[in-house]
Amino acid sequence: TEKNKEENLKLIEKLAYEMGFKHIKRTSPQFHDEMIAFTSQLPHVLAVALTNSDIEGRNTGEFIGDSYRDLTRIANMNEKLWSLLFLGNKENLLKVMNRFEKEFDEIKKSIEEDDEEKLQELFIKSTKRREKL
């Protein structure tokens, strides 16, 4: 924020680099919270929802591969901490959840309508966007 002194910001950046962080970016608190909602909190929401959507009592563990393991690794979380983080960034988190839901529904609709062309368009779009990261 404008209250921070330049010398203090440089000191924090130096410490972060010394700790091994490679990408340090100065940003506003508002933009930080928007990005954290999308890049950290939404993936945790998805991991919890995916894990909890399984039918209890099945031997799912005998069938999982790397995709499931990768997506659900972060579902093993500190419930007290993450509850506070989600609620503390509620407005931003709900916005990204709504955007995700819209994309999810588009994929679902394409499957329901046997729209192979639309599915492929969505896959191509995501591949191109992922390559830019």
Write out the residue ranges for each language-model feature.
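Internal alpha-helical scaffold of NAD(P)-dependent oxidoreductase catalytic cores
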Residues: 1-74
